[in-house]
A protein has these predicted regions:
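Transmembrane beta-strands of outer-membrane beta-barrel pores
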Residues: 2-4, 32-36, 47, 69-73, ...
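Short sequence motifs at beta-strands and strand-loop junctions characteristic
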Residues: 3-6, 41-45, 99-107, 166-172, ...
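Outer-membrane beta-barrel translocator/receptor signature
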Residues: 1-49, 57-61
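Face-selective signature of the C-terminal outer-membrane beta-barrel domain
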Residues: 116-134, 162-310
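Acidic/polar loop-and-plug regions of large Gram-negative outer-membrane beta-barrel proteins
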Residues: 33, 54-118, 122, 131-171, ...
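Residues on the lipid-exposed face of transmembrane beta-strands in outer-membrane beta-barrel proteins
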Residues: 12-16, 51-55, 111-117, 176-182, ...
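Outer-envelope beta-barrel architecture signal
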Residues: 8, 22-26, 59-63, 109, ...
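Structural signature of Gram-negative outer-membrane beta-barrels, strongest in the C-terminal barrel
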Residues: 58, 171, 190-202, 272-382
Length: 382
C-alpha cells in the first residue's frame, strides 16, 4: 500500500502445515514500511520478520515457538522550537532541530516458547518463556534547553543552543510465566481458580556508553551546557566577549539549519552506563465465585523486586522491595440488561534503585502506589 508522506508499506502472511498429519504448523509474517513525515528530516524505515511454529501432538497439548525480529531506522524528533517564549506559530510546524547526519538505529529480537496443556475439562496449565534483546545506536543534535547565550547574560532568541548525544546501549529481558486454571463447584457455588507464578529479569549489557558534546567551550578543555556571567572567565570567548559554541547553534532564520554537521572538532565528554540488573518474582492467587446472579472475584498477588547496583563488581549491592497487592470485584445481575458492580484494587510500582539511590536525581524516591474504589450500574437498553 502507499499513502501520505511518501509512505510505502508491504505486508505478507504465509501459513500452513509442515507435516502430513498437520501436527506441525507454521506461520510467517513479513513487513516493510518506509515513510517520511510532515516534520523536516523525519522518517521511519522498518523491517519485521516474524516466524511462528506450533506442534500439536493431540487436542489437549500445544507447543509454540514465536520469533519476532524488527529493524527500525529513523531519527529522534525533539519537538518544534519557536522564537523566545512567544508565538507558537512563529516557526513552521515542520521545523525540527535534527541534522542530516543524525540517526537512530534500533534492533529488537523477541523469542517466545509457550506450552499449553488441558488435563481435562476443568484443569489446564499454561507456561511461557520469552527472551528479548534491544540494541540502540543513536546520534542526535538536540537543544541544550535554551537559546544561544551572549556575554552580557542575555540570549539571542533566533538561535537555539545545541548539544550532541552519540549513544550505544544493549538490553536483555527475560520473562517466565506459569499459571494453573481449575474450575470446580462447591455446592451451588461455581469457582474459577487461578494460581500462578511469574519471573522477569532486565539487564543492561556491558559497553553501554554515550559521548556528549555540550553547548559552550571552557578554557579547561571541556564543555558545558550553560553560561554564567559571574564565571565568565572560565569560558572561551570570542572578540565580542560572547561564549564560543562547542556545537554550532540552530539558526531559526536559516533555511539550512538541518544541513550536515561537521562533528570532528566537537569537544566530547563520556558517560558510561554502569551494568545494571533488576529481577522480579510474582506469586498470585485468584478465584471467581458465582452464585446465581452474584459474581465475586478475589485476588492476592505478592511481588518481590531486586535491583543489583554496581552489578558484577566488588561493590555490588542488592536493593529489595516487596508488596502484597489485593483486588476485589463484584457484579450483581439484577436483570439481563442491568448490572450493579463494585471494585477495589491496589497498585504498586517500585522506583528502580539506580534512581532512588541517586542523590543527584533528587532521590531516594518512594514506590508509586495506587488505590481504586469504584461502584456503579451498567445497563444496555438498545
Amino acid at each position: 500500500s502507499m499513502g501520505s508522506f511518501n509512505t510505502f508499506r508491504l505486508l505478507s502472511d504465509f501459513t500452513g502445515p509442515m507435516s502430513k498429519d498437520k501436527k506441525l504448523l507454521y506461520r510467517l509474517n513479513l513487513g516493510y514500511q518506509n515513510t517520511d513525515g510532515f516534520r523536516d528530516l523525519q522518517f521511519n524505515k522498518n523491517i519485521v520478520v516474524a516466524p511462528s511454529f506450533s506442534f500439536i501432538p493431540n487436542e489437549k497439548t500445544r507447543l509454540n515457538l514465536d520469533v519476532v525480529y524488527q529493524d527500525n531506522k529513523g531519527r529522534l524528533d525533539r519537538g518544534q522550537a519557536v522564537f523566545g517564549d512567544g508565538d507558537l506559530y512563529s516557526t513552521p510546524i515542520t521545523t525540527s532541530l535534527s541534522a542530516e547526519n543524525d540517526y537512530l538505529n534500533e534492533q529488537n529480537l523477541n523469542v517466545t516458547l509457550s506450552f499449553q496443556h488441558k488435563f481435562n475439562e476443568h484443569i489446564s496449565f499454561n507456561s511461557s518463556y520469552m527472551n528479548s534483546g534491544y540494541d540502540e545506536d543513536l546520534l542526535e543534535h538536540r537543544t541544550a534547553n535554551n537559546f544561544l547565550a551572549l556575554g552580557d547574560g542575555s540570549y539571542d532568541i533566533t538561535k537555539v543552543a545545541m548539544r550532541v548525544f552519540n549513544r550505544k546501549r544493549s538490553w536483555n529481558n527475560q520473562n517466565f510465566t506459569n499459571y494453573l486454571n481449575v474450575d470446580f463447584n462447591l455446592g451451588a457455588i461455581e469457582n474459577k481458580l487461578l494460581v500462578g507464578y511469574d519471573y522477569f529479569q532486565q539487564e543492561l549489557e556491558p559497553g553501554g556508553s554515550q559521548l556528549e558534546a555540550n553547548a559552550y567551550l571552557l578554557k579547561n578543555g571541556k564543555a558545558t551546557n550553560s553560561f554564567s556571567v559571574a564565571k565568565k572567565d572560565n569560558y572561551v570567548l570570542d572578540e565580542n566577549g560572547n561564549p564560543v559554541a562547542n556545537v554550532a547553534p540552530f539558526d531559526l532564520t536559516s533555511t539550512n539549519g538541518n544541513a550536515m554537521r561537521d562533528m570532528s572538532n566537537y569537544v566530547y565528554g563520556i558517560r558510561n552506563y554502569d551494568r545494571y540488573k533488576q529481577t522480579g518474582n510474582g506469586i498470585y492467587l485468584q478465584n471467581q465465585f458465582q452464585y446465581k446472579k452474584f459474581n465475586l472475584l478475589v485476588g492476592l498477588r505478592y511481588d518481590d523486586f531486586t535491583d543489583y547496583l554496581n552489578y558484577e563488581t566488588a561493590e555490588e549491592e542488592k536493593i529489595s522491595q516487596d508488596k502484597f497487592i489485593p483486588r476485589i470485584g463484584m457484579v450483581y445481575k439484577l436483570k439481563p440488561n442491568v448490572n450493579f458492580y463494585g471494585t477495589w484494587v491496589k497498585g504498586y510500582q517500585p522506583q528502580t534503585a539506580t534512581t532512588i539511590n541517586n542523590p543527584e536525581a533528587g532521590g531516594p524516591f518512594d514506590p508509586l502506589t495506587s488505590e481504586l474504589f469504584e461502584a456503579g450500574i451498567k445497563t444496555e437498553w438498545f
